[in-house]
């Protein structure tokens, strides 16, 4: 795992971990990252440690080197159903993650910036996309336009709908 295991809260990998990884590989062990993050959210300094593979997006994708072993995508219908649900229930802060990027709502962008996070700069800039700026072809839907393996949402302290209701209402797709 990366967060809180391989790297600290500032995404710094200690020298002891770097040494341990190198020693394990020198002794013939294969090293894999297993993370909830999508690959575009893994910092270059972590990937540069030379892992043999990555299990990412909470197990929805697996790669060995540059070879994709499998990838589970959220169906276009599920994305569209969730987006309609978010709109209906005034859920403004959500994101979708996949191998080609992170797609975020304006509410999620505000959330990141309120935490001092720079979402569209540095090594990750090309992977971040505001959902409102996605060019959805005529006759298509967002669900058919983006390819993602994971989504999440955040509500305020008094949401219009409970987590349990959301879980129940979106159960046909998730």
Question: How does the language model describe each region?
Answer:
Residues 2:
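Residue immediately C-terminal to the conserved phosphorylatable aspartate in receiver
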Residues 10-117:
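Active-site phosphate-binding/coordination module
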Residues 97-174:
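Conserved acidic, metal-coordinating active-site core of Asp-based
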